Amino acid sequence: MASSPCPPTCIIVLMDRTFMFVGALMGFAGVGLGAFGAHALKGRLSPEMLAVFETAVRYQMYHALALLVTAVLLTRTEGGRAVLVAGWSFTAGILIFSGSLYALALTGVTILGAITPIGGVALLIGWAALAIAAF
């Protein structure tokens, strides 16, 4: 019987580093996009589309922090599987929710707003998974 190349503890270490990296990267991008919105887009976008862009930045930043917390919780709690679900849900949620709002604000293509709720549901799943991990 062949042994697994990476035992479960190895997977947790890989995932906590992955979520730390993705969270830090999303935070970095959020700061840059926030500055871009405040300086380069003000006056170029309608007030409504600028508000959409700012909402995308805000949710990206909140969930970048949630990913960093998820990375820490992976090594500090017994709820490994639920914490993994939370991390991947936050990652997907940021990409879909904030990504679709950025695209909507920058292009004005309103159909892009139709996928935003999918990202919102992913973010909600992430928070629910963290709550489950507490037990």
For each of these PLM feature ranges, what is it?
Residues 5-7:
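N-terminal polybasic/positive-inside topogenic patches
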Residues 10-135:
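Polytopic transmembrane helical bundles with strong interfacial aromatic enrichment
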